[in-house]
Swiss-Prot record:
UniProt xrefs under Pfam families: CTP_transf_like (PF01467)
Keyword Magnesium: yes
Transition state stabilizer, annotated site positions: 17
Record's protein name: Phosphopantetheine adenylyltransferase
Functional description taken from the UniProt entry: Reversibly transfers an adenylyl group from ATP to 4'-phosphopantetheine, yielding dephospho-CoA (dPCoA) and pyrophosphate.
GO biological process terms, semicolon-separated: coenzyme A biosynthetic process
Amino acid sequence: MKIAVYPGSFDPITNGHLDVIQRAAQVFDQVVVAVAHSSTKEPLFSIEERLDMLRVVLQKLPNVRVDAYRGLTVRYAREQGARALIRGLRAVSDFEYEFTMALTNKKLAPEIETVFLMTEAKYSFISSGSVKEVARYGGCLEDMVPVPVERILRDKFGMRGEG
């Protein structure tokens, strides 16, 4: 069985993330969407809230499961029996950082490959940070996040209707 781990903070999940997950699910037998506990970022949503959001959004993908982890991503991937890490790329500017991380991960776990998937062009401008900024100021989130996540963001920021 070909297992891949797609790690990230998913704070919140965006349509760009969803695009990468859906395409990874077509390539791998099982995809583990792994929410990282971060000691360096202050998240908007708790781990539990992010896991719940992901479960709602991904429920129709039978070969995708959601989990949380701490520590080194490659260690977690090994524990899951994964042979690949999925990394989404929005633009060339993402590549330098991701390439450096891929080399580091390869040094730590030579048996685990990093697979880069480009998001569709229509999602290339979306990041969790930009989504939070738009939501914070009551802007339109249409096409940026899945509908259930839009509702959660509107509740979180006390927004009403369309931005």
